[in-house]
Design a protein with these regions (language model features):
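An anionic, glycine-rich sequence signature occurring as long contiguous blocks
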Residues: 2, 242-359
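Flexible loop/turn segments at secondary-structure boundaries
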Residues: 83, 146-148, 181, 191-192, ...
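Dynamic "connector" segments at or just before major functional cores
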Residues: 1-167, 171-193, 198-207, 211-214
Length: 363
């Protein structure tokens, strides 16, 4: 009788240096986390000892164990029987065999994998079960440069911080901020920036979260200046979303700052001041938006002593912004409290999607 490729021998005692990860492995096996992938992602490859999904699973375990690539499978996973046994594997495929399975994947396989990942997210996430009637769903959208070898798929020259002339790719991400859950990850070539990636990322998030028109009306999309153009914001508004963004145009930012007569010191940052307020949708200097927006001018003292100016744009009511930052919605009539709430709400991007990128790169 052929031995199954999963299901460790309960009579064998083993030890591992990855005890906490082994516990996670037992739990993931209980959840049958890879079930949708096993059922929905057929890979045209002959099975000798391990099925294609078995080999994908080995690659997944190796990544959880800290591997930076499939080349580390032999050293990190294959040499640790207790660890792969905890994940339900009786043995581990050799790294070159796992790589062959990756090479056998096609564009159709990628689409099938995305559908399977959607099924996994919906089955186990809080973001998918969010109650839109009780509160706002917050989605952060951002990009991060991922340097790589020049032979890697989609590798092109692009912008990578502190690494000039380095080939790489851009990772686009949508994060369900309240739950610290990655809703969508998509890989783009090294030249792609958020202004180009915004549309496919948002549409993918709509698919994963099953966002109909009513849910989109209760969803706040938060983006930086890379997608803060009038056309980008209007596209989101046309889809029915609320938006919190930083204006892409320095000309509009300078124009608004020149109109501010009362700059208020930011109590959280002594080098920053805030000013601004509601702007009608038909204000040509603000940009022709599809609905009334609030624009808050923010200036920060730079190292050369001059002011750096930015503008935060938001479609939320002040009471909603105050509530989202833990303030009192009754302060919505206070211009200073409202302006500060919008700025603080934008600042929280740094504790959301930007933090997830840093954690990914630090391991």
């Amino acid at each position: 009788m052929a031995h199954p490729t999963t299901g460790p021998d309960p009579l064998v005692q083993r030890s591992t240096a990855h005890a906490s990860l082994a516990v996670l492995g037992v739990y993931l096996r209980h959840l049958d986390l890879f079930g949708p992938i096993r059922e929905q992602v057929p890979i045209a490859q002959k099975t000798v000892r391990y099925t294609p999904v078995d080999k994908l699973y080995d690659g997944f375990i190796a990544l959880l164990a800290g591997a930076h690539g499939l080349v580390e499978i032999n050293g990190r996973l294959r040499a640790d029987p207790a660890l792969h046994a905890a994940f339900g594997r009786t043995a581990c495929a050799e790294q070159s065999v796992v790589q062959d399975t990756g090479d056998a994947c096609t564009g159709e396989t990628v689409s099938q994998m995305e559908a399977a990942m959607d099924a996994i997210y919906r089955a186990h996430s809080q973001g998918y079960r969010h109650s839109y009637a009780q509160g706002w769903q917050g989605l952060d959208v951002d990009m991060s440069g991922m340097p790589c070898g020049k032979k890697a798929a989609l590798a092109t020259a692009g912008y990578f911080a502190k690494q000039r002339n380095r080939p790489g790719r851009q990772l686009g991400r949508v994060l369900a901020t309240r739950y610290h859950e990655i809703v969508v990850d998509r890989l783009f070539d090294g030249k792609t920036q958020l202004v180009t990636a915004l549309l496919p990322l948002i549409l993918a998030a709509e698919q994963t979260l099953a966002l109909d028109a009513a849910k989109r009306e209760r969803t706040l999309v938060r983006i930086d200046a890379g997608a803060g153009s009038v056309s980008d914001i209007n596209w989101l508004l046309l889809r029915g979303y609320h938006v919190l963004a930083k204006d892409y145009s320095t000309k509009r930012a300078t124009h608004l700052a020149a109109q501010v007569t009362d700059w208020v010191p930011d109590p959280h940052d002594p080098l920053r001041q805030i000013g601004g307020g509601p702007v009608p949708a038909d204000d040509s200097h603000a940009g022709q938006y599809r609905r009334t927006i609030t624009r808050i001018a923010v200036r920060c003292r730079q190292a050369n002593g001059q002011w750096g100016i930015g503008v935060v744009i938001c479609t939320l009511a002040a009471s909603d912004a105050l509530q989202l930052v833990g303030g009192d919605p009754a302060l919505a009539s206070d211009p200073q409290a409202s302006a500060l709430a919008y700025v603080v709400l934008y600042d929280q991007r740094g504790g959301g999607v930007e933090t997830t990128f840093k954690e990914d790169k630090q391991g």
